[in-house]
Amino acid sequence: MAGTPHIMIVESRYYEEIAQHLIDSVLKELSDAGARYERFEVPGAFEIPAAIGFALEASKLESNATAYDGFIGLGCVVRGQTTHYDYVCGESARGLQDLALKYSAAIGYGILTVENRDQALARARRDGFSWNCDSFDDA
């Protein structure tokens, strides 16, 4: 990639406090890397792959569509009392992996899958998002 990387961030802010910790660490990493970014919000983690997929498909089909060098999906899924958690976690991960393979796209997976709010906060507050930004070094 030549020049300044342009990153699409797709975030679910369903759990506002957790989402804020995640985006703060991502924006710090992108700022440190000198990257440009655009943020898009979706209702939940399940919708993150679709939003990224729409952008990838648009850039392939439309000459005036915004082209991104990489993508970051951010969200949090907390286990509840039904199987909904399993479906959302599995399908959001599978959806992003399928997109990465189909389009040879650099996609950072920043969707926390946790048992409870305390665990989510502990993971969201940890050492930033650097654990997931290495994929953009080679984008």
Range-by-range predicted roles:
Residues 20-21, 49-53, 82-86, 119-123:
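Short, well-ordered secondary-structure micro-motifs
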